[in-house]
């Protein structure tokens, strides 16, 4: 099975797309064969959309099985989500995909987000929300990937951060990279509990680590 791909001819697929258990959001003009691969491998429905007029859909949105968070000013895109609950992050610090790290049970977010923003995330995604960092990085959304089966994060995650992540999500913390050593591995990985797709530069050992961490090894 093919598990590596480019979107817009680049391997940083997590910047341009994001997925949940049910859907994958991709920018318009994503190649049909790429959409077909994502649909088949991840077992999801493809939605083509801009977010705030931008093609960096993965950097600007974050969702789970309960809904999607979009940035301040993105109400024009809400009409594309007719069957998906959508919330708008009220803060100006709002590259949602970069600053929210979430699955169906919890979310870790940028430590500078306001209480109002945390309330909006909790209400839309229906999860408990916590402020924190991964490897000292505030943009937690790209510093790892979490699904309903596993957790993979930046290699420089600290012991105290590991403890917090394990408590929040209930999984052991695994470390890894994508795209031949990229430590902000969320930029090169789309995953749900059914499967994953990584950027085209991701190596065999990196793919093996992803499989192990996210629960795809028999």
Curated annotation (Swiss-Prot):
Query: Which one GO biological process term can you cite for this protein?
Result: assembly of large subunit precursor of preribosome
* Pfam families per the UniProt record, alphabetical: eIF-6 (PF01912)
Write down any Gene Ontology CC term: cytosol
**What keywords are annotated for this sequence in UniProt?**
Initiation factor, Protein biosynthesis
Q: Is the Nuclease keyword given for this protein?
A: no
UniProt-recorded Gene Ontology molecular function terms = ribosome binding; translation initiation factor activity
Write out the function statement from the record: Binds to the 50S ribosomal subunit and prevents its association with the 30S ribosomal subunit to form the 70S initiation complex.
Q: Which family does it belong to?
A: Belongs to the eIF-6 family.
Q: What is this protein called?
A: Translation initiation factor 6
Q: State the organism of origin.
A: Methanosarcina acetivorans (strain ATCC 35395 / DSM 2834 / JCM 12185 / C2A)
């Amino acid at each position: 099975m093919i598990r590596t791909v480019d979107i817009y001819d680049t391997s940083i697929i997590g910047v341009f797309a994001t997925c949940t258990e049910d859907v994958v959001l991709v920018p318009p003009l994503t190649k049909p064969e790429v959409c077909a691969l994502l649909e088949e491998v991840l077992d999801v429905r493809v939605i083509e959309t801009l977010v705030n007029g931008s093609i960096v859909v993965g950097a600007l949105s974050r969702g789970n099985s309960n809904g999607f968070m979009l940035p301040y000013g993105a109400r024009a895109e809400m009409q594309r989500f007719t069957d998906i609950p959508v919330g708008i992050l009220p803060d100006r610090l709002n590259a949602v995909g970069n600053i929210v790290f979430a699955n169906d049970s919890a979310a870790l977010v940028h430590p500078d987000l306001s209480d109002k923003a945390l309330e909006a995330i909790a209400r839309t995604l229906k999860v408990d929300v916590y402020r924190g960092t991964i490897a000292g990085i505030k943009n937690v959304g790209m510093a790892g990937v979490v699904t309903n089966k596993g957790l993979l994060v930046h290699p420089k995650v600290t012991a105290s951060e590991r403890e917090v992540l394990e408590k929040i999500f209930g999984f052991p913390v695994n470390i890894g990279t994508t795209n031949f050593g990229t430590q902000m591995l969320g930029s090169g990985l789309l995953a749900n509990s059914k499967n994953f797709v990584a950027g085209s530069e991701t190596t065999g050992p990196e793919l093996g680590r992803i499989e192990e961490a996210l629960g795809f090894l028999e």
